[in-house]
Amino acid sequence: WIGNVMGGVIGACLYVYSGAALGKSDYIGEFIVEQVAIKMGTPSGQLFLRGLLCNILVCLATWMCYKLKEETAKLIMIFWCLFTFITAGFEHSVANMGFLTMGLLLPHDAAVTIGGWFHNIAWVSLGNFIGGVLFVGLPYYFITDKKKSTKEAEKVA
């Protein structure tokens, strides 16, 4: 998690200081700051649920990569899971680590604060964790045929 924060902050710094967000017009930077202010002002319960739902989709995409054999099927599954979480407006803590940092680095108003960054990341991270563990990780752990998995592992070894 700490490594993701560091990566998000470094990536945000590189993007903002490259000038790409402020090009010939400030539309991109203004859009980023507007969206960051919305994310920082979202109530904690909504952030938690958006994080929970998001990570169910992200974990399903990851799980399907292990279960599907064909590369094309894997790509399609990843695309649809990620497309769904993005278009539905769900929240992922790792994506927000960089995006919210961009809003802090760009010229912004009082709605964008370091406290808002922590508010969003804390609730979304908690939702991501519970969504991934309770709704994907544990159910698949309990339904996986352990005898078959052990035999497959022995064949590989």
Put a short name on every predicted segment.
Residues 1-157:
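Alpha-helical transmembrane segments and their helix-helix packing motifs
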